[in-house]
Amino acid sequence: MIYIYNDFGGTHTTMMAVAYHLNQLPQSERKLTTDEILNIKYFNKLTKEDFGKLIFHGKDEDGHSVYTIGRRSQDLVVPALRDLFLLLHDKYNFDERIVFSNTSPTVPFPMTMGGFFSRTLKINSIGVPLLVMGAKQCCDNVFRLVEYTKEVGKSNLGKKVVVLNNELFKS
């Protein structure tokens, strides 16, 4: 199975989700510390050149591959990737199940503003504190989203491709 966490930029909640998924963060709903947030690999590190790139982060405890993608528009990238994977399944005997999990609903307003200041305007002195504030606000939701994503991945065995929009995790 392949898990692909995705959102607009691919560098904040997606990286938090990967860190939870790969047991690099405490496996609980407790609030993260500033150091834990800032030490998440790739957190606030990706640039616009990274949009649309599938980034491999490792294999989980069950041996499943975990990726992220900054997709800008969910209306284009995720459906295109879903159709590509279905084509590979049908025509070329590609045998991996794919779970796309959208982390965008977990993004709180401070994180949106922090991403804008830090990634777009390059004003880290304003952006990073807002990102940390936002990450602390949403970390429990991101943790629950990851747990849900894993459950769905294990339970939807008949589906080749699963797309989770995750609106129930809205911040």
Where are these regions (language model features)?
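Non-transmembrane, aqueous-exposed alpha-helical and coiled segments at domain scale
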Residues: 1-4, 12, 16-171
